[in-house]
Structure formats: structure tokens, C-alpha cells
Amino acid sequence: MADTVENAVSTPDVEQPWAELGLSADEYQRIREILGRRPTGGELAMYSVMWSEHCSYKSSKKYLRRFGDLPQQTPLGPLLAGIGDNAGVVDIGNGLAVTFKAESHNHPSYVEPHQGAATGVGGIVRDIMAMGARPVGVMNALAFGPLDAPDTARVLPGVVSGIADYGNCLGLPTIGGQTLFDPTYYGNPLVNALCVGVLRHEDLQFAKASGVGNLVVLFGAATGGDGIGGASILASESFAAEGESKRPSVQVGDPFMEKLLIECTLDLFNAGVVEALQDFGAAGISCATSELASAGDGGMHVELDRVPLRDPNLAPEEILMSESQERMAAVVRPDQLDRFMEICAHWGVAATVIGEVTDTGRLHIDWQGERIVDVDPRTVAHDGPVLDMPAARPWWIDELNEDDANALPRDNSGEGLAGALLALVGSAQLCDRSWITDQYDRFVRGNTVLAQPNDAGMIRIDDNLGIALSLDANGRQTTLNPYLGAQLALCEAYRNVAVSGATPVAVTDCLNYGSPYDPDVMWQFDETILGLVDGCRELGVPVTGGNVSLHNRTGDESIRPTPLVGVLGVIDDVHRRIPSAFAHDGDAVLLLGTTKCEFGGSVYEDVIHAGHLGGMPPMPDLNAEKALAAVMVEASKRGLLSSAHDLSDGGLAQALVESCLQGGLGVSVSLPEGEPSVMLFSETPARAIVSLCGNGYREFKELCQEHGVPTARIGEVIDHGEIEVNGLFSLPLDEIERAWRKPIPTAMGE
């Protein structure tokens, strides 16, 4: 028998499993004060999940508010939607807008790698749909333990196949991403997914239930027991003891249903029969109903027993908490219901009226004619606790910073430099990712202009207009200094977009950290936010939204602080895009920017010095990044460049290797004056290499001078397969390529 509101009033002292559901004693007491009684089982289920770290951001909210202090303006105009909405929306002109967002699915992807990663893709796609947009592309950023670790061989293939199967079935190109390997991710991989969508301004949707008498329609997949965690405790121990006890499970995705749901939803938008829309993500119906109702101007009444079920034995608390995938909730006017149902039927998508908008200001949920939930929806969705967790600068960080990576020995002989280059390209950090990326369809839909292994992914929006995206993170640099590390991730993503020829306009993030109960972690988080806010303000790009994932740890060891930063760019003419591959024999190769001795957190430090981490990370130069971006965007418009590649992991050496291997051409260079290993392997930011034909050299050099970007002509593209560093060494490309391609297939047993 369901625990009703009437029963809760008459039995105030019933023992409830609030602690098992993750609530503190103070939080449980606050719920009782809000309600003026004990919560019912359904109410306790809703509050527990909506006040969880995952849904409420209770440990991070006070820091995240700083993003709201940034100007809500992009270089192209005001944001159309931002933090607090399902996804940020950016005006790109001509009545068009782009929405994009990144989210994490870390813990489910360790428990069940394939389904965990697949449903991570599905969830972020529905967030984009909920804004009224057609999803047009996805990206991912992954982090695993050591490549040769036994569990990596289990987790990595499952995660990659899950992403590939779901994204490919949806017909969405996977246009880019990143894969990291580091011991701290062993036992706690990171699976961060990004989706981008396109819409017209008039199609923008918000999750706001308004209009008394309007109907609440659930459409999509039936509801099952997958994804239930805390609610199973309520159902099996307290409220449905006779039912089957269900252990927490990872959600199960159905990409074919999601594809139907996408097309159905877009048809519903086009028909004008949707007043508001919300996807079913974490917390399922609990989240969708409370967020819709709290953002509206009235209340909502839901009849829970109308929800179509895959498992007829689910208790009401489980239905409220189920995270079954491929479900949406729409608010529909009664006179539009028939047309709404016709469109759903056309696509084979089940749709059921489960409630209506009311004028009560309350969220009422009934089960078989009895009230099991009676709450102010805002107290569930928005008024959760805001914690002030202790934060303290770690005692160990001074010692770490004093262990200067720049002081480590470096072999500057020709043989030593060649050996270092081969070691770096053959390392897990820099080796070929095609074993991963070849499983993704990068060109489905026919609008992909650039994709991996280019610096940014680029998609055509119309005949000429395009968007570019990049995702970047570096946990090693952020460990050394979280403020600077966050800015370095921002700068790299910003730079990757710019070197493709696009103007960077907006930012999303996915902040992956350890336990919020660890003061070291919260200090790292605080410093990260400060770094991102200051960096975004200086670069002139707003943070449109994102995600926080805490409790990423194995035993007592937290992962490295890993802020993933995604940058969106806009390019007026995709035909002027700049690829990263060398294209023409005889093209001049130029190094842009200033190179300093900066090895802290670098791949050279890690690989050559057996995992060493120490010193300070490279110093970001935000003004130099803006100047470099301005040069690259203008050079793209003028069609001056054959190729461009940013310098980051592995420095100049790795950029040369990648541009050669992608283009099937060699390069002959003479290093600028200075220590050869610094010139080749330092990771100073705000740098790029470009190639161009001779008749554009003077114009490009003048452009760089106009913006104050240092340039050095270091060599030329050659038509035979070698990388020649004059006076030091020469390596055949086929030898480099063998070292580069080998690590991941070998680790995967191929």
C-alpha cells in the first residue's frame, strides 16, 4: 500500500530511511519543517534525489554562481539562454541559434561501460532537444587509468562502443574529443559528452509549465526499473517489502527509440503544439515534474498510475525515481492534444496524458486515487541545501611546485632528441587515437567539415555558415595549480577553435573532481572557478552552462582535478576553414608565438622522467591568445593559409608529427635560437604552426605584426617522408608512424 499524505499526517513518528538515501539529519529535519509533517515515501524519494549532489549542486553551487557575474554576451550578441536552462543558446545571426552543453556520466560508465557511456550520450542529446533544437553533432572527452592496466582493457572498449553505437544509430557525427590516460583515473574513468544543436530563434523552448488546464504529456519509452538507486530502498524496505528487492542499476539506452523521439519532437515543434518541454534525465519524473512546475506560474497535478510501465511491479516511489531513458514531458493545450497524439502515433512514439497544470502553486501526485505527494515544487527543484564545505590549500602543493620540472635533465644531442620524439609519439598520452575514433561515424548527415584528428570539429549550418567546437582538459597541469590549469584548458580549447578559422564565442564546462568532503578538493574547485571566470572575462566569452561531477575517487584517492572546457566558435564561410594537415610541398612553415622553458605538467616531463610531476604549469597569456585568435580568423577570411595547428601537448615536435602524418608529407625545419629540447618539447601556450604558399607570406607576416604576434619562419613542407631538424636529426615518417599507431591496438590485444 502506498504511503499517502493522509497516512504521513497520522503517523508522524514512522522510521524513515533518510540516511540510506543520502540525506543528512539536518536535511531530513528541514524537509519535515517545509512540509509541516514527515514526508511520504514518494516525497522522501523526490527530495532525496533532487537534493543530491548530482541534481542540486549543493557543494558547488556557491562557487558556480560566479559564472553569473560574467557578461551574458558573446562576441555576436546576447545569450538567448544560459546557466539554469537545459543548455546554453547562442545567437549566430540570420535568425539562427546554436545550443550546446557538456555533461558527465562517469560512475555509471565504470559499473557498466557500454550502457553507462551510451546513456550519457542519450541524456545530453535530450537536453539539446529540450531547447527546441535539432541535434547536429556530438563530442566526448574520456579519461582512463594507465593504458596497460588490466581494467582499462575492460572499461575503454565498452565506453567507446557505447558512445559509437548510440551516436551512430542516432545519425549524429562524433566530430571530436579527447582521451587521457593517467593512474588517478584507474577505477574512476571520466566519460564526458557534449552535444550541439541548431534552431531558429522562434523555436526556442523553455521548461516552464504555464496555462491552467494545459495537459502534461509523457511521451517516449515506457518506464522500467533501470537507473533506480535510492528509491529501491524505499520500495523494498519500507513501502513495498513484499516486492522484489532491486539493486541500483545503470540505465539502459535504446538509440533507435531516441532517434524516433528526436524526429517526433521536431515535428511537434514545427506543428506548434508544444507549450513547454522537459527531458527526463537524472531523477526521472521527480525532476521533470518539479522543474516544470516550479518554473511555471501555477502548479501541477499528476496521476502517477497513468505512467506506462515496462515492469508492472514497480512501486510508486520507484516510478518517481526511475531513470529509464528516451522519455520527455510536454505541456500541451487541450485543443492541441489530438494533433500532438497524431504526430506521436506517426512516429510510433507512445504518448500518455499524466496530468495537468493547475493554479494551486503545489505539485500534487496521486497514486490509484490517493495523494502521495503534496509539495511546493520549488522546494524540491530549486531550494535544496547550499553547503559551505571546508576548503584549504593543500599542504603538499608547495613541495610539489618546488620540484621544478624545468630543472630536470634534458638531452640535447641529436640522438637524444630523436629518441625523445619517438618516446613521446609512442606514449599513451600522444599516440594515435584512431582505434577509438574510427568506431565513430564522423561524417554522417554530410555536414561535417572538420573532424578528428583536426584541432576542432566543424559542422556546416547552411551553405557557408559553420560552427566549430573543441573540448580540452589537462589534469596534470591543474594538479600543479588549479587556477592556471583551468585557464590553460580554456586557452587550448579557445585556440583550437581559432586555428580552424572560427571566432570563439562561448564556453561550456564539465568539472570533474574528488570528494567534496576533502578540503583539498574544494580548494582546487574554488581556484578552478576563479581561473575560469577570470579567463572567460578576459577572452570575452561567457560560460553558458555545464556540469559538475564530484565524488570521483577510488578508495581515499581522488582523481586529478579535471576541468573539461568546451569552446564554441562560428565561421562565416566553411570553405575558408583551416585544416591541421600539411597540404603542399614547398609551403613555408611558420612558428607563431613565443617559446619559453615550460615543462611543468608536460608530456615530456611525464614520459622522459617516468611519471614525474612538479613545478608550475605554463603561464597563460590571455592577451596573446586573443591576438593569435584574431590573426587566425582574419587569415582564414583572406584564405592565406594551407594549414594551422595549435601547440599544446608535446609542443612543437608533436604538432609537426601530426601535421606530417595527417598530410602524408614531410617537413624540414631549423629550430629558432635556444635550447633544442625547449624549442621542440616545451608546452608554452598561445602558439601555433602554420603553413602557407610563398606568395601569401608577406601579407600574413604583416597581419601578425599588426596584432603583435611573433613569427619565425622555421622551415618548409617537403615531399619525402621525413622530419628533418637541421643540424640535429632526421627521422623517417614510417618509423614515427609505427611508434605512434602501436600503443592502443597492442593494449587492446590486437
Curated annotation (Swiss-Prot):
Residues noted as binding Mg(2+) 2 in the record, renumbered to the chain: 127, 279
CC terms in the record's Gene Ontology section: cytoplasm
EC number in record: 6.3.5.3
Cytoplasm among keywords: yes
Any single biological process term in GO: 'de novo' IMP biosynthetic process
Pathway as given in its UniProt record: Purine metabolism; IMP biosynthesis via de novo pathway; 5-amino-1-(5-phospho-D-ribosyl)imidazole from N(2)-formyl-N(1)-(5-phospho-D-ribosyl)glycinamide: step 1/2
Alphabetized CDD domains for the sequence: PurL_repeat1, PurL_repeat2
Localisation: Cytoplasm
Assembly notes: Monomer. Part of the FGAM synthase complex composed of 1 PurL, 1 PurQ and 2 PurS subunits.
Protein name per Swiss-Prot or TrEMBL: Phosphoribosylformylglycinamidine synthase subunit PurL
Species annotation: Cutibacterium acnes (strain DSM 16379 / KPA171202) (Propionibacterium acnes)
